Amino acid sequence: MINIRKTHPLMKIVNNAFIDLPAPSNISSWWNFGSLLGICLILQILTGLFLAMHYTPDTTTAFSSVTHICRDVNYGWIIRYMHANGASMFFICLFMHVGRGLYYGSYTFLETWNIGVILLFATMATAFMGYVLPWGQMSFWGATVITNLLSAIPYIGTNLVEWIWGGFSVDKATLTRFFAFHFIFPFIIAALAMVHLLFLHETGSNNPTGIPSDTDKIPFHPYYTIKDILGAILLILTLMLLVLFTPDLLGDPDNYTPANPLNTPPHIKPEWYFLFAYAILRSIPNKLGGVLALILSILVLVIMPLLHTSKQRSMMFRPISQCMFWILVADLLTLTWIGGQPVEHPYIIIGQLASIMYFLIILVMMPVASIIENNLLKW
């Protein structure tokens, strides 16, 4: 009798994606982040669903409903903090996943890569809208500042901002629509993630060497299911350490003050995972220029396949490119630090230099390093 998992219409899909999938025999722990992102997404949808049962999207009651969840709902505090810190874990995994793709040349799978960039944008939009929902000071002012950036668009900017706000300022209409979008977006992300996987399974996974591995494949189960379970345990352990010991470590104290349109916080800043982009935005004195730089800082990922000048796919055997990559990582960490600092003397110039370096490394230094390596190998 043929195994049901190979014949049943639904089981067959699961089987071909997670059980009998031929996988390269040498993929490292950097390939764990895809499954970890899936776990993060499921965790966020589940905790978010339970939070939505008790949350009220109204300017007068939003803040107190979050307080109510933490104080009165059974295990509400742990659900709330798992959701808030789960977002941080989600972005840590996302950055690692994208970094892995850049290092090992995974961007040559064009469809998979481009859907991945769309997924990154969708996740960032979802996280931003979620940050507005508790209706604290940083929620309100973050929403005001970031949505206001659209007013830099020539001609239609002001109308566009008022259309998004649903009025002349961030108010009840804004909060309600952000809640609606924040609820629906994770399901769109889940659907896109399936398409992401669909295209990945058309080509098969890349591997650290960047060399085709068709001659040396192993079944996904049990080898990589076990490996993924180890990753999942470490992810959940890290998340629960955050949640149970330092739940507010990555949050902003200002968000424990209810939103007040008459009182601006001294330093308006987004969550830590947006600080690198926020630093790039702030480092340009022109509003439209800043907005364009902000969008391009993420959109530059789309042109990575065009910037690939090396004859090798992976950076595994390319020491100069490796140096460039790690300089880029250091630069992103610098930008993240600057994004959280006030706009004053040493920080402004450091932010501007780091922003220039960011685009310079990606657009000039990495392609040039690849050409130098080609010539050194006489290719």
From Swiss-Prot:
Its cofactor is heme b. It is a multi-pass membrane protein. GO terms for molecular function: metal ion binding; ubiquinol-cytochrome-c reductase activity. Heme 1 (or BL or b562) is low-potential and absorbs at about 562 nm, and heme 2 (or BH or b566) is high-potential and absorbs at about 566 nm. A ubiquinone binds at H201. Keywords: Electron transport, Heme, Iron, Membrane, Metal-binding, Mitochondrion, Mitochondrion inner membrane, Respiratory chain, Transmembrane, Transmembrane helix, Transport, Ubiquinone. Heme b b566 binds at H97, H196. Component of the ubiquinol-cytochrome c reductase complex (complex III or cytochrome b-c1 complex) that is part of the mitochondrial respiratory chain. The b-c1 complex mediates electron transfer from ubiquinol to cytochrome c. Contributes to the generation of a proton gradient across the mitochondrial membrane that is then used for ATP synthesis. GO terms for biological process: mitochondrial electron transport, ubiquinol to cytochrome c. Belongs to the cytochrome b family. The chain crosses the membrane at residues 33-53, 77-98, 113-133, 178-198, 226-246, 288-308, 320-340, 347-367. It comes from Ovis aries musimon (Mouflon). Heme b b562 binds at H83, H182. This is Cytochrome b.
